[in-house]
Each structure stands twice: as C-alpha cells, then as structure tokens.
Amino acid sequence: MKRSLLPLLLTTLVAPAIGAEPPTAYDQGMAALTAKDGTTAVTAFQACLAATPSDDACRWQLGWAYWVQNDWQDVVSAWEPLAQRTPSYETIARDLPSARAQLATQTAAQAARASAPATFPPGRSVIRLRAVGDMMLGTLFPDGALAPDDAAGTFDAVRSTLLDADITFGNLEGPLCDNPAPSDKCKPDAAPGSCYAFRSPTRYGTLYKAAGFDVVSTANNHAGDFGDACRIETEHTLDAEGIHWSGQPGTVAEWTVNGEKIGLIGFHTNMACNYLNDTAGAVALVQQLVARDDIVIVSFHGGAEGSKAQHVPVGKELFYGEDRGDLRIFTHAVVDAGADLVLGHGPHVIRGMELYKGRLIEYSMGNFATYGRFNLSGAQGIGEILEVGLAADGAFVGGRIIGTRQEGQGRPVLDPQNQAADLVRALTASDFATNGAKIAQDGTISAAN
C-alpha cells in the first residue's frame, strides 16, 4: 500500500472538522514528523505497523522518524526489509546507503569514545572564547517564517553557557533587515520552499546581544540575499548593539579584551566577501592584522553542504558546481601567515579539527540556531559550542566541545550525550591522522597532538 507523502518541511496542518474521523496512527506520525518530534512519530508509526505489518508507507516514515533522532541502526533496520521487497520505493535507493554511512560513522564515534582519555586538564589562558556555527532565528521571507514567540526564547537553554566566555562568536546566516525589497536570489514564480533566502528583522539584533555574542561573521552565502541595502542595514544594526563583525571585502573586527588586542576576519567563497579562494589575498589581509593585533582569529564559510559533507577532502570542494574552497590549503596558509585560531562553518554539519603549528583549526561547527527553513534531521541537527583557550602569544592551550542539538523547528539546547564531541573525535581520526586534535570523553581538547 502506497500513500502520497507529505513533505517533511510542511509547516502548517489542517485540523479535522468536527465529526470527522479521528486521525490514523499514520496521520499522527506525519504530524509529529512535521513538528520534528521524533519520539512521538516513532510511537505512531510503530502502532501503524503493528496494525498492518505490510504497510510500506508506515515502514518508510518510521525510518524517517528514527532519522530525526539519529538512531541510525533503527533506520537501517526499518528500511532494509522495504528495500529488499521494493528496491524502487520512493528514494530508498539513495537514502538507505546514506543511513548506513551514518551508522558507520556513529559506530566509529562510539568506539573512539571508549578508547579516549576521560579528560584533559586545561592550560593557562588569557582569552577564553566560545564559538558556534550557523545562526538564523527566523525570516520575514517568506511570510510566516518567524517563531510564534518572535524568537525571544531562542537562546534560553544555552544563554548562560554562551555568556560564560571572554569572547563569544557565531556566524550570522543572513541579513538583519526590515527593508521589504524583493530578493534577486528568488524568481517571482519560484515554488514555495524552492528558494532559500533569509531576512531576519533588525529587532533580533538585541537577542544576539543579550545571548552574549561579541562578534559575528557576515561572510557567507546568505549575507547578500536581499542586496547591498540589507547588508548595510545589518552592519548598522550590529554596530548599534555593540557587536563586532567582519564580512564585506576589507572589513575586519578589532577590539580589546583583557588587555589583548583582538583581530577577527571572516572569509567566504564569494567575492562579495573577504574572498577565501584568493589565498594570496587572504594571507595579505591576515598579515595586516598580525602587524597590529595580539591575537588574530580567522573564520571561514566554506565547503560542501549536508549530511554527506562531514569529511574534509583533500583538494577543492564543489557544491552544485560552485567552488567552495580548498580548505586545507586555505587554513594552513592563514596559520602560516600568523592566524592563531581558525573557525569554520557552512557545511551545516560538524567536521573534524586539526592542530597545525600549535594553532587549532575547527573545520565546521555545524548548525547552532537555525529556525524553520533548515533541514535539522540526523547529523544536521547536531551542533556545538566550541570553547578555546588562548595564551598571550595566541597559542592554543586547551579547549572543550560542549554538545548541542536543536529541538522543534530550530531551538538550541545542551546535549547531555555530547554527540558533537563523539562525532568530532571520529571525524578527526579519519581525516587528520597526523595533526588531529585529541578529544577526551568529556569533550575536553588537548593542547598537544
């Protein structure tokens, strides 16, 4: 039996009319998936299968319910009988191999955790930074993509953790702009959900400030979604909140913390930002900061995207034909030029980390607070708050991965399982056998390779 499937990104449901038949277990499961409530969805689809074991639609959606919860063994167990019976069912030929790959990564992560030290003692630092990946708290485009509480509670579960640092950094994925001008990125006849352009209201600037963000990157593929006017309005909004920023070509953030002059520059693989793909130009910009600042931080938005982009390849990355950078070349070049810390974001998944010449390189911190328009299933719902300790000379003296995950439509909460630490540990062992950072069971990071 095969039903038409509701898209997982559906955001509204039609309530049954008075006197209508009560929703079936399948309907209840789909409603739960729409709300990204994996636990309820699993219960509903299990009930559906218990009533009709041959119901392929229930089995298929049960796999997606497990997917939302990162229960990869259960995804594979749910789908393998379906694939054997109906190899062409929906997109199972594509998605079952992806689930198997995620299961292999999860199994490796669990094995690596078991063999890791319990903890690493922190070193003596003059600057303690906490950093997160992509943030977009809700968008005015399309209409109705704001949270019911107008994003007021976005950071409630993580605010105290973000505030507990000398510097707190994040990637601002899209402009803060009240200008109603249309986006050149989206065609007027584009189907709903087919074009991803973000524009958050300027009032959200106060939410970032209240959560403790001192500096953000505006160098990313959504910064220009609504043109130069919105980029400028974003910069003015951040300035008014006292939040430092770097994004457009030549822009850097510089300020003083604990008596140390800090310089930060954000790069992206688009020439409308400090340009990641121009290695010589990037080196020159970093050297300018090194000449006048005590500690220099580089952030970059680069790499392919999605659950298949967890590994850092050797060489250039392409995403839908776009050059998303040779990240190993770029990161090593900026450290050689004097950068003390390199923070990556953009793939929407966590990646491994490297210690290169005593400097930490985190290749992707994943999604952190991305409301409504983002796929948060599986690995894309796992994030981190990366703590980094830096000495007066910029050397890495220790750190910690504080795991997060997103609930519902995209609200960050602390993850007691710290799946992020386990993922980073396994991905690091796979991708950086020589220079990989060492991560203990509690998420602390050693200052030595």
Spans of features found by a protein language model:
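Register position in tetratricopeptide repeats
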Residues: 34-35, 68, 98-106
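Alpha-helical tetratricopeptide repeat
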Residues: 22-33, 60
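Acidic, metal/ion-coordinating pockets
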Residues: 104-449
